[in-house]
Amino acid sequence: MQTSQKHHSAAGLHMLYPQVYCSPQFQAKDNKGFSDIPSKENFFTLESSTASGSLPSYDSPSVSITSGRSPFSPQGSQSCISDLHHSPDNVYGSPLSGVSSLAYDEAGVKSKIRELEVSLLSGDTKVEEFSGFSPAAGKSWNWDELLALTPQLDLKEVLVEAARAVADGDFATAYGFLDVLEQMVSVSGSPIQRLGTYMAEGLRARLEGSGSNIYKSLKCNEPTGRELMSYMSVLYEICPYWKFAYTTANVEILEAIAGETRVHIIDFQIAQGSQYMFLIQELAKRPGGPPLLRVTGVDDSQSTYARGGGLSLVGERLATLAQSCGVPFEFHDAIMSGCKVQREHLGLEPGFAVVVNFPYVLHHMPDESVSVENHRDRLLHLIKSLSPKLVTLVEQESNTNTSPFLSRFVETLDYYTAMFESIDAARPRDDKQRISAEQHCVARDIVNMIACEESERVERHEVLGKWRVRMMMAGFTGWPVSTSAAFAASEMLKAYDKNYKLGGHEGALYLFWKRRPMATCSVWKPNPN
């Protein structure tokens, strides 16, 4: 444990210092929800959608998310959805009944998740968009002819046809399409050409049964820690995805701990600890003095490699800042994967108000479809047993956990097309740093989702509708994201491309690229029952 009474040098540590935005004052949550969000050009709601389910225009004057600020309960609505991928126009709204029971039931969780999965995949319009093309009746593919036509082919169609052949076990056709794809993709091309490079690599790895080997190779052939940190910094600066997580969670945490004198934050993806630099500075301004702040950070191997050392570096950096700000500070490390965490690893002490932060990490926890241990739900029940004041959950809005291979491939194609477009808006296509950042920080995840299965597939995203089921079954009640957090996120987005937007639905805050939801922030409290 480090305390702020010991002076530690923070030189040469984390490069990803967060420029986190907040409202001028952090006030206790009122009963207005998102009733008055500044910067309305950056904000729209899902509630104002038409009956057909299409999203409203981005300059919609309506910014109301909830009619009341009180917590919404499972009984408040029979809809547990947040899937915005139900049609090409992001139609949302897929009823899921019977989620009112909060008593944990493993079979019940599986049943509700399966029910939602069926609802999401029924009439899978994303796959149906690619109706397929085929050679003339009774003829086989003429690959030489197809290669000659590559300038006229739609790259997305070719990618999906290759994936369809893989799914059907038609290896000859799959390899034929991969040869065509080699002539169409480029790491320095358009967003779809760059993405196509990595998706084709994933397909080839799956065909050759070397998915896990290639995934491990990508991990083993990483650049040096300093280089990787540099590439991570590039993505951090040109895309708002991590700042969205840090900004919204920090505002929610500050509001939740107002008036507390002893605060314990447990972060399951603390990475470089950047989020808490801002938090410490804000706590130092608290009227009447700051609380004693205790932070438990859970580690992962990638963060250890990137920062060039263990969690002690994070603790030293935060302790140094806390001391300079006059904030009493303690740091506890849990050097292990999140799925291995037990209660005794968290450094709990009596008398602390506990807050738990899950930033883009729960999707790495294996669930009931992977392991009988079901660490995803086990961890949520562990957190519930701590009686936290607040749990913040930020995740990618994508459905790749249990969907069949072809549906998963098309979902990955859709999601990462938007991500690569958003990166493209910030850096030139021939920018070497951008190319390296995509190769070393994004490609590995894509290959893992396409090439690997069972326990070796660690990228298992779920849409908020599924997280809602899991949180409710674990004994949590959803709580609307505050006006202050929405304001802070809106202010943060002013530094980015105008195609980034905010939206809200059932109390959660969504980050969009154009019409595609990319990430969600939701807030949870233990059910009093």
Curated annotation (Swiss-Prot):
One of its GO terms (biological process) is regulation of DNA-templated transcription. InterPro entries: TF_GRAS. A motif (VHIID) lies at residues 263-267. Its main location: cytoplasm. Coiled coil: none annotated. GO terms for cellular component: cytoplasm; nucleus. Expressed in roots, hypocotyls, cotyledons, shoot apex, leaves, flowers and siliques. It comes from the Eukaryota. Induction: By osmotic and cold stresses, and UV-A/B. Belongs to the GRAS family. This is Scarecrow-like protein 13. The gene is SCL13.
